[in-house]
Amino acid sequence: MATYSTNEFKGGLKVMLDGDPCSILENEFVKPGKGQAFSRVKLRNLITGRVWERTFKSGESLEGADVLELDMEYLYSDGDMWHFMRTDGSFEQYAVDKKAMGDVEKWLKEQVVYTVTLWNDNAIAVSAPNFIELEVVETDPGLKGDTAQGGSKPATLSSGAVVRVPLFINEGEVLKVDTRTGEYVSRA
């Protein structure tokens, strides 16, 4: 496997650290007035999700992590596992557990493509597309003249997620939602 020197560190790079695959979130090169230069790196463990900071002396290197990020279509859930299928024509299916799903579970919609991270042929993380279109299944009716400023109300979506929406949104409407922030963007 390839090794990466500290001068090759950048956000999004996948490396092995203490036997676990990690993703570099931030890398700051520091050259103090006295002493050796070093890199202050913020990493996320891809298995546990833990984020921490480490410093590496200039010239140190880390082994690259053998992880695959594949686009997979969400098929169904059988209670404790979520099933995804590769979209590259192989139709290979992967079962993903609750830990790997994280908070993506509330943005799941059948036949939508998600990014699944595999390590040693096991799914360790799932990430949703930036925007997803979901139907409103429950919300209070918005009354005209209800407020002086533009107000908002909670709405439950078909996936179970609850987002704040403008008063003019009604049940049955399809909304575009930002999965990174959990905020309403527009009507679909």
UniProtKB/Swiss-Prot annotation:
May be beta-lysylated on the epsilon-amino group of Lys-34 by the combined action of EpmA and EpmB, and then hydroxylated on the C5 position of the same residue by EpmC (if this protein is present). Lysylation is critical for the stimulatory effect of EF-P on peptide-bond formation. The lysylation moiety may extend toward the peptidyltransferase center and stabilize the terminal 3-CCA end of the tRNA. Hydroxylation of the C5 position on Lys-34 may allow additional potential stabilizing hydrogen-bond interactions with the P-tRNA. The modification N6-(3,6-diaminohexanoyl)-5-hydroxylysine is found at K34. InterPro entries: Elong-fact-P_C, NA-bd_OB-fold, Rib_uL2_dom2, Transl_elong_fac_P/YeiP, Transl_elong_KOW-like, Transl_elong_P/YeiP_cen, Transl_elong_P/YeiP_CS, Transl_elongation_fac_P. It is found in: Cytoplasm. Keywords: Cytoplasm, Elongation factor, Hydroxylation, Protein biosynthesis. Pathway: Protein biosynthesis; polypeptide chain elongation. One of its GO terms (cellular component) is cytoplasm. The keyword Protein biosynthesis applies. It holds the Pfam family EFP. The keyword Cytoplasm applies. GO terms for biological process: peptide biosynthetic process. GO terms for molecular function: translation elongation factor activity. Belongs to the elongation factor P family. Involved in peptide bond synthesis. Alleviates ribosome stalling that occurs when 3 or more consecutive Pro residues or the sequence PPG is present in a protein, possibly by augmenting the peptidyl transferase activity of the ribosome. Modification of Lys-34 is required for alleviation. HAMAP family: EF_P. This is Elongation factor P. It comes from Chromohalobacter salexigens (strain ATCC BAA-138 / DSM 3043 / CIP 106854 / NCIMB 13768 / 1H11).
